[in-house]
């Protein structure tokens, strides 16, 4: 009986010392702003560099990506981490070829990410970049869409919710696909070139929202 009493006391002591279960942090209400940036100050965490390949930096109240080599992509993230997220940005081609890439990205982890892009000549695509390989989702090549306005400010929105990826251009949904390879990660902007260098893009009014 003494052994049983000691044993029960030991079990009680272990239970008393055990850490309380960790409660999951509740998600912000739908529509809550998680992060926003007007790029008015240059200390909000985006990349700042210049080399022979191009430039990424704050520029005249926006964020600029200049790509000086053909077949090259640049992207930048503010070092956040979200699962489900809605991201929006205004972008404008400053100079360079109309055949370009410019857009948003979500669930960035170790280089892997989903991307939502348009070109200044009116094409769009949703895809993923995994292990150094870019793959379009739901389409074999970039498709044209009349909602894309060449040489004007275009408002992009990307919803990354569960395995559903939805792309909006100028407040109109243009594509939606499903993929479950990536579940969470950083957010950001990107620009890239095809055969011609000199892609020069400005981003502004970046916001991340709880879906």
Outline where the language-model segments fall.
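C-terminal motif of bacterial Sec signal peptides marking the signal peptidase cleavage site
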Residues: 14-16
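Bacterial signal peptide processing site
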Residues: 18-20
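Extracellular carbohydrate-recognition regions
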Residues: 23-50
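Secretory/extracellular carbohydrate-interaction modules
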Residues: 67-131
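Localized edge beta-strand/strand-to-loop motifs within extracellular or lumenal beta-rich domains
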Residues: 152-166
């Amino acid at each position: 009986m003494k052994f049983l009493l000691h044993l029960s006391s030991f079990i009680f002591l272990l239970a008393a010392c055990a850490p309380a279960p960790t409660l999951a942090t509740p998600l912000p209400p739908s529509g809550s702003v998680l992060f926003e940036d007007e790029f008015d100050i240059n200390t909000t965490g985006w990349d700042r560099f210049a080399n022979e390949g191009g430039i990424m930096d704050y520029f005249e109240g926006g964020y600029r990506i200049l790509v000086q080599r053909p077949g090259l992509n640049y992207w930048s993230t503010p070092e956040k981490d979200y699962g489900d997220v809605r991201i929006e940005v205004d972008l404008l081609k400053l100079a360079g070829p109309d055949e370009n890439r410019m857009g948003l990205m979500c669930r960035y982890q170790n280089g892997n990410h989903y991307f939502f892009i348009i070109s200044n000549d009116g094409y769009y695509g949703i895809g993923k970049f995994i292990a150094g390989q870019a793959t379009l989702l739901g389409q074999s090549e970039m498709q044209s869409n009349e909602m894309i306005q060449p040489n004007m400010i275009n408002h992009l929105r990307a919803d990354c919710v569960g395995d559903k990826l939805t792309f909006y251009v100028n407040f109109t949904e243009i594509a939606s696909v499903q993929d479950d390879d990536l579940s969470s990660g950083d957010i950001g902007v990107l620009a890239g070139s095809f055969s011609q260098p000199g892609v020069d893009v400005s981003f502004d009014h970046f916001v991340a929202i709880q879906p």
